[in-house]
Amino acid sequence: MRILYVITTPDHGGAQVNLLDLMSGWSERVESILATGAEGFLTEEARKLGVDTRVVPELVRPVRLVTDWRAYRSLRRLIRATKPDIVHCHSSKAGLIGRMAACAERVPVVFTVHGWAFEHGISTPWRIMGLLSEHFAARICRNQHVITVADADKRLAITKKVQPAERMTTVHNGIPDVPLRASPEGGDPPTIIMVARFFEQKDHDTLLRAIAGLEGAFTLSLVGDGPRLEQVAALSRELGVADHVAFLGDRNDVPDLLARAQLFVLSSLWEGFPISILEAMRAGLPVVATDVGGVRESVIEGETGYLTNPRDVDGVRRALAMLLADANLRKRLGGAGRQMFVDRFGKRQMLVRTASVYARLVGENRTNGIVAEV
């Protein structure tokens, strides 16, 4: 079976990691082809897997009508040339243009939603545009199926009437397990870690304002890169917490960094089902996160971590203070999170559920045996 995967940007993010886990998890019965808008992290890693990688330069994130039309035409040509059995799109922009192109070529198409473009927290004009585009895509293409990475996203789509329930399936993100590298309680002073790109969505500002009121010794490690990095660094100096904060940049040793930390935080304004939280749970870390998107489907209040409202400086501070002050609490919540990861969010579970979605479109005889032994 041949699958064409389409995504807009190749940057290092949750959607890209999810896509790599899919492409690396299929047996030799699957031939994967990747189409993305530029060279970057994703194309480099895909080529290491032996994936046929195509750059479609017109496939860009900003809305540009002429360029978007060219991207649509380019994807149609690519579909005709590669003759995939399924087109599988990731991210909102690729999800719209890719579905249009696949349906025009009469190829079954899957769209994985890594958070809707009309999520709460996104600016009103973009929410309206995202909602209209999803209504449009749902109506022009009948031979499609939508994968939501969280039940919350599926419920939101039903509420907004963008897709019928029978055309959607929740497949939680899953990642490969790795051995615990070290005791999460080895740090002195304790290390708080956040792994996220420096974008408005991740709201590093709230986290910095929260730690400005914390007492005692601790370190905050911020892993990632992005356009707001310098702005966040300046805010850390303005708040007088720069000595507590380490900006580590984009890293390829995140499991090691998590193994040396004592607790994980994610202060996002909106999310789908964050892979970064799964990585923290895999490492046995308790999690403090904002209650957005599908976050509460992995962070169980008082069991695997604590939930706060978006932009709730005091709430983040209280949760961090409780965990910093109590090593036994960190161990209990982190251990429960680790067990939940093993039980529910492994890579194989994700692959099996994704294969079942493919089977709905092309038949079980085409998808039997496509999941590798992982």
Predicted segment positions?
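N-terminal strand-loop element at the rim of the active site
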Residues: Y5-T67, L156, R167-T170, G226-R228
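A conserved mid-protein helix/loop that constitutes part of the nucleotide-sugar donor-binding site
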Residues: G13-D21, P190, M194-G213, P227-A234, ...
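Short hydrophobic beta-strand element within catalytic cores of glycosyltransferases
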Residues: A35, P286-A289, V299
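Membrane-proximal helix-turn-helix segments that form the acceptor-binding/catalytic region
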Residues: R73, R127-V146
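A short, active-site helix/loop in glycosyltransferases that binds the activated sugar's phosphate group
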Residues: I140-R167, I175
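Aromatic "clamp/platform" in nucleotide-sugar-dependent glycosyltransferases that forms part
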Residues: D250, L269
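Conserved acidic donor-binding segment of nucleotide-sugar-dependent glycosyltransferases
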Residues: E301-G302, Y306-V313, M322-N328
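A short, well-ordered alpha-helix in the C-terminal region of glycosyltransferases
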Residues: G315, M322, L329-S356
